[in-house]
Amino acid sequence: MDVIPAIDLLAGRCVRLYQGDYDRSQVFSENPVDVAKQWVDEGATRLHIVDLDGAKAGKVVNLGAIEAIAQAISIPIEIGGGLRDRSSVEQVFNLGVQWAILGTVAVEQPQLVQELCQQYPGQIIIGIDARNGLVATRGWLETSEVLATQLAIQMQEMGAAAIIYTDIHRDGTLAGPNLDALRELAAAISIPVIASGGVSSVTDLLSLLALEPQGVTGVIVGRALYTGDISLKEALQAIGPGRIQDIPPNLDFSSFA
């Protein structure tokens, strides 16, 4: 399973929010490039970047920081936040980003998503951010009437490469992932699901590993890495491609669920 460190950008700095609340941000570094290099040095094979300013503004804002990170590291990057038109998506791909994460437009302009999936096959990921099972949009400031599972099915049909599922009530809380919601989502589609939000311990990571056969292929870890609750190295050893040992086939996963 992929363990993907998150870098959230706000005014050019690396921060973490609590439940998506911009007024409850905590600055972890003034230099996101140094943070990106640190995760690479610790074994990351992929990086998740969110332009928080962009998510609110509806356009990419932290271009300089994104470009600097892309130039400084060699592992692939996925970027989300403010990608709501074709030019913004083209803009980040021109910076050397591997995947573009679309959220709001998936709800508001599904036809555009389909066109972008055709133009960039395998490079469009849909970020589904849910509050009580309903999709939130525009930097989590609005909640739609669209069910997360319904949107995931529609986006799979449009050609999306993967779904990143974030439970907003868990994000930044270290309260553990929403396993039931992830299980339901993964069962509804055949493309990979990447879990995000709430991971606080190796136990949480192992509980997600139990969902890997159902299609949960990765996990994004944010606050827990920055607070030291989890080290990236131990996360990779626990559930990553280089994990210490394979899990016995007769292990009862029900205790994790």
Swiss-Prot record:
Where found in the cell? Answer: Cytoplasm
List the pathway annotation.
Answer: Amino-acid biosynthesis; L-histidine biosynthesis; L-histidine from 5-phospho-alpha-D-ribose 1-diphosphate: step 4/9
Swiss-Prot/TrEMBL catalytic activity? 1-(5-phospho-beta-D-ribosyl)-5-[(5-phospho-beta-D-ribosylamino)methylideneamino]imidazole-4-carboxamide = 5-[(5-phospho-1-deoxy-D-ribulos-1-ylimino)methylamino]-1-(5-phospho-beta-D-ribosyl)imidazole-4-carboxamide
An example of a Gene Ontology cellular component annotation for this protein is:
cytoplasm
Which sites are catalytic? Answer: 8, 129
The record's InterPro entries line, in alphabetical order, gives: Aldolase_TIM (IPR013785), His_biosynth (IPR006062), HisA_bact_arch (IPR006063), Isoase_HisA-like (IPR044524), Isoase_HisA-like_bact (IPR023016), RibuloseP-bd_barrel (IPR011060)
**Main EC class of this protein?**
isomerase
Q: Which family does it belong to?
A: Belongs to the HisA/HisF family.
Name under which the protein is recorded? 1-(5-phosphoribosyl)-5-[(5-phosphoribosylamino)methylideneamino] imidazole-4-carboxamide isomerase
